[in-house]
Amino acid sequence: MSNGSNGSRPPGEPLIVLEGLKKAYRTPAGDFYALKGIDLEIYPGEFVALLGRSGAGKSTLINMLAGIDRPTAGEIWIAGQAVHKLSEAGLTRWRGREVGVVFQSFQLMPMLTCAQNVMLPMDFAGRYGLPRQQYARARELLATVDIAEHADKLPSAVSGGQRQRVAIARALANDPIFIAADEPTGSLDSRTADAVFAVFQQLVAEGKTIFMATHDRELASRVSRVLRIEDGLIVEDLRPAEAQEGRQHVVEMEA
């Protein structure tokens, strides 16, 4: 088993550090550990795919990184912030300002326009000035994901792939430290998934750090680093050259 990188790592200090991360859920049969002790470093500008079967711990780890849930034990350090020590109010503020989250199911507000959905995190964090200034930024972000022409439409008026682009723009609203994406292409057809994935690749090229949980082994083969999780433990940590050599492990994963 490997909880750290086997290959060369980017220069500089890690952006995200996980130390002994565990998460247990109480069940009638006793505590069930979804994460069993994760040690991990993620560096600025990396595009990391967390690959694993359903129930392996992917979403749990994403929720820990995004501040949606708390660990049972261990430490989470992101850009020098001890996330595991934050109060509930502090965690909510930190998450709203510093993390961009993209879910499989879009989670857009149906009665708000695409632009208004992108404005929500700005309003929550009290950033980017007056509503007209927030609207201008929302349009800029929608242009970044090539959907500005739909800014004033309701989510129901655009396609699934376009809704996911709106969700990505919303995740970028407060210029987050990193983006946590949980199966962001899981509900899309392959062509639309490729288009959404290309948006992520462009964001990484511009310097963003992305941590993406997926069961799509083909998409996972196109990132800068692949982690494989099984039964709450990271069992492989591969960078590009190693990922090619270790591809036989990836092809065993269930779609």
Q: Could you tell me what each predicted segment is?
A:
Residues 226-239:
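H-loop (His-switch) and adjacent beta-strand-loop-beta switch element
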